[in-house]
Amino acid sequence: MEGKNKFNTYVVSFDYPSSYSSVFLRLRSLMYDMNFSSIVADEYGIPRQLNENSFAITTSLAASEIEDLIRLKCLDLPDIDFDLNIMTVDDYFRQFYK
């Protein structure tokens, strides 16, 4: 049986109260340390800057595994409560430009 690695590009968006803005600077650094990016190519291959609360990654992980990884890494941050939305890059741009 031949194994295939299927890679997908996901965009992770955070939603948090504005009072957490200083903590978000640490979160942003953490995301970059985990190889997330703030720029991603759209379906036409054009690089696009994501909004300030969004990050992209190309990975073989499933969306649920990405969320688990982020929440695990965030345990070192101060006790914050944030919503996390993970979608494929195509879904992100469809939602963003509709």
UniProtKB/Swiss-Prot annotation:
EC number(s) stated in the UniProt entry for this protein: 3.1.-.-
Q: Does the keyword Transferase apply?
A: no
User: InterPro entries attached here?
Assistant: GhoS (IPR022597), GhoS_sf (IPR038241)
- Record flagged with keyword Metal-binding: no
Expression triggers: Post-transcriptionally down-regulated by MqsR which acts on the ghoST transcript selectively, degrading the ghoS segment while leaving ghoT intact; conditions which induce MqsR (e.g. overexpression, nalidixic acid, azolocillin or H(2)O(2)) decrease ghoS expression and thus increase ghoT transcripts.
- What is known about its processing and modification? Unlike other TA proteinaceous antitoxins, this protein is stable with and without cellular stress; its structure has been determined in the absence of GhoT toxin.
Q: Which effect does the record note for changing residue 31 to L?
A: Protein becomes toxic upon overexpression. Becomes classic type II TA toxin protein, increased cell persistence to ampicillin
Impact after mutating residue 25 to I: Protein becomes toxic upon overexpression. Becomes classic type II TA toxin protein, increased cell persistence to ampicillin
Give the phenotype of cells or organisms lacking this gene. Essential; cannot be disrupted unless ghoT is also disrupted; in the double ghoS-ghoT mutant has no visible phenotype. Increased biofilm formation after 8 hours at 30 and 37 degrees Celsius, has risen higher by 24 hours at 37 degrees Celsius but has fallen by 24 hours at 30 degrees Celsius. Approximately 2-fold increase in swimming motility. When single ghoT mutant is grown in the presence of antibiotics carbenicillin or cefoxitin initial metabolism is significantly increased over that of wild-type, after 14 hours wild-type is slightly less active.
Q: Explain what the record says happens when changing residue 14 to A.
A: Still digests ghoT RNA
Q: Pfam families per the record?
A: GhoS
In terms of superkingdom, the source organism counts as Bacteria
The molecular function GO annotations come to: RNA endonuclease activity
Give the note.
Has a similar 3D-structure to Cas2 proteins.
Cited function = Antitoxin component of a type V toxin-antitoxin (TA) system. Neutralizes the toxic effects of toxin GhoT by digesting ghoT transcripts in a sequence-specific manner. In concert with GhoT is involved in reducing cell growth during antibacterial stress. Overexpression leads to transcript level reduction of 20 other mRNAs involved in purine or pyrimidine synthesis and transport. Not seen to bind its own promoter DNA.
Instruction: State the oligomer form and interacting partners.
Output: Monomer.
What's the protein name?
Answer: Endoribonuclease antitoxin GhoS
The protein's organism comes out as Escherichia coli (strain K12)
The record's gene field reads ghoS
